Curated annotation (Swiss-Prot):
Keywords: 2Fe-2S, Cytoplasm, Iron, Iron-sulfur, Metal-binding, Oxidoreductase. Catalyzes the reduction of hydroxylamine to form NH(3) and H(2)O. This is Hydroxylamine reductase. It comes from Shewanella baltica (strain OS185). Its main location: cytoplasm.
């Protein structure tokens, strides 16, 4: 086992990364090894997808499968060995299918079949024992003694960034958004990473290419969400419990939320969002469901307590899931899509009757809590609608600075930095937030500036796209570069989606971003120095010191 993809990975003087019997996330060594083998098989599929494309062969089914299966290897997504093995076996089937199509096309065209790298040649074992025996070939640091640590760090930066992009591709696909060119570029990068490179410049360029690719993917996801559900609008949301039977929907998949809402109409069940599903409450399409009553709980890391206290059924539509046995709710939590946990019921297809039956059998909330509301829904359209008023307030001096504070949440004590930063921002500044990092401060009162709320909840982590659009619009109005705006970006990172959002921002030329609370363990000190020199990227320090720098206070 070797896994170093998230913030909670083991860090010791002897080396970083989880490499024992179990990772800090709860992932067993066997699961980690099977995930590495799955990635290896997917890279082999991409090798042949690239070759097939050269002969004009595009398989949309395979284009959709590879990022979806890759998504299953993200932090806190799928812990079910049987499901991971099934993905690997499906990958082997698709690779053989593409290989046959490619070779037939070459024969018909009268050209030689090109040799493929080792990553596209492995004959996958048929049992768990056989697959685990093959896993060392796919170990991410298998050649760590032969290559420089900076090269290893760049490889992992690319791999983990592409994982984040794969997740967004799958979210977009669920909403009907696919693009053959995007899929083609994705396969090219997967294929490249399947042949471990020692070219630092090429790896760095690839990291920026992944950022650019993800910008296109985020635009696709934005289109999918707004076409399906309308543009988010400022919305007041209750964050307290409501009396009645209950279902809690966590993750990111709004299509699943829609299906659950449709299937619970008239059944006397209240539906609550959780975590990154909170932004769904701002979409017009969901406002026609009066039994979508609010948001319950906070960010992913608190789920073992929050789900244990929730008196209904819980559905995990995507990341992040953690051990449901700790809170003794494994019999009433259900997984969807790429999510998996051994022993937990997995919902295939679009029938949520098992979830509904479980909710009806449980007690539900026995009384209404006193409501506490927050305002959400400041995504792209709402931000653009507010832009003229924002510009006027900037020109008048009422608004002097913008902060984007968001990203992933986590349970480290030093994440209180983000709470204190938000509380310490000047009263003449606006705070944009997104991702589950918002839960560090989104229930606090920040007031407004001439009717414009100081705290603007942009949405899910992928809605960084909305924030980018606002920054571009403001830069055009003020006839300046984005980096010349009075804008400071402070991103909390935990896993691979945050990595690819960061790569997207860097690839767009956005500079002087702060990330925290701790730097990724796979980034060497030298790589961190290069990123700081090239982009001004730096780690958070103290709220007082960082604010002085961001506000140019001597």
């Amino acid at each position: 086992m070797f896994c170093i993809q998230c913030e909670q990975t083991i860090r010791t003087p002897a080396g970083n990364g989880c490499s024992y019997s179990q990772g800090m996330c709860g992932k067993l060594a066997a699961t980690s090894d099977l995930q590495d083998l799955l990635i290896y098989m997917l890279q082999g599929v991409s090798v042949y997808a690239v070759k097939a494309r050269e002969q004009g062969i595009i398989d949309a089914e395979i284009d959709s499968f590879v990022p979806k299966a890759f998504f299953s290897t993200l932090t806190n997504v799928n812990f079910d060995d049987e499901r991971i093995m099934a993905y690997a076996q499906q990958a082997a089937h698709y690779r053989a299918q593409l290989k046959a199509s490619y070779e037939a096309a070459c024969e018909q065209a009268g050209i030689a079949v090109e040799q493929v790298p080792q990553v596209a040649q492995l004959v996958l074992g048929t049992s768990k024992i056989e697959m685990l025996a093959q896993a060392p070939i796919a170990l991410l640091n298998k050649d760590k003694h032969d290559v420089h640590e900076d090269i290893m760090g760049l490889r992992l930066l690319c791999l983990y960034g592409l994982k984040g992009a794969a997740a967004y591709m799958e979210h977009a696909r669920v909403l009907g958004q696919t693009d053959a060119d995007v899929a083609g570029r994705f396969h090219e990068i997967m294929s490249f990473l399947g042949e471990p490179s020692v070219d630092g410049d090429k790896l760095f360029t690839t990291a920026m290419d992944i950022g650019q690719l993800n910008y296109r993917i985020m635009a696709m996801l934005d289109a999918g969400e707004t076409q399906a559900f309308g543009h988010p609008e400022p919305t007041v949301v209750n964050t307290k419990s409501v009396k009645g039977k209950a279902i809690l929907v966590s993750g990111h998949d709004m299509k699943d939320l829609e299906l659950i809402l449709e299937q619970t109409v008239g059944k006397g069940i209240n539906v609550f969002t959780h975590g990154e599903m909170l932004p769904a409450l701002a979409y017009p399409a969901f406002k026609k469901y009066p039994h979508l009553v609010g948001n319950y709980g906070s960010a992913w890391q608190n789920q073992q307590q929050e789900f244990a206290n929730f008196p209904g059924a819980v559905v995990m539509t995507s990341n992040c899931i953690i051990d449901p046995n700790v809170g003794s709710y494994s019999d009433r939590i259900f997984t969807r899509s790429i999510v998996g946990w051994p022993g937990v019921v997995h919902i295939e297809g679009d029938d949520f009757s098992a979830v509904i039956d479980k909710a009806l059998a449980l007690e539900g909330f026995i009384y209404d809590e006193i409501p506490h509301t927050i305002t959400i829904g400041f995504a792209r359209n709402a931000l653009m609608a507010a832009a003229p008023a924002v510009v006027e307030n900037v020109k008048s001096g009422a608004i002097k600075h913008f902060f984007l504070v968001g990203g992933c949440d986590g349970d480290k004590a030093d994440r209180s930095y983000f709470t204190e930063l938000a509380k310490s921002t000047p009263k003449d500044s606006l705070i944009l937030t997104l991702g589950c990092g918002k839960y560090k401060f989104n229930k606090l009162e920040f007031g407004d500036i001439n009717g414009i709320p100081r705290l603007l909840d942009v949405g899910q982590c992928n809605d960084a796209y909305s924030a980018i659009q606002l920054a571009i619009a403001l830069a055009e109005v003020f006839e300046c570069d984005i980096n010349e705006l009075p804008l400071s970006l402070v991103l909390s990172w935990f896993e691979q989606k945050a990595i690819v959002v960061l790569l997207t921002l860097l690839s767009l030329g956005v500079k002087n971003i702060r990330t925290g609370p701790t730097p990724p363990a796979f980034l060497t000190a030298n790589l961190a120095k290069i990123l700081e020199e090239k982009f001004g990227l730096r780690n958070t320090t103290t709220v007082e010191a960082d604010l002085k720098t961001m506000l140019n206070v001597a």
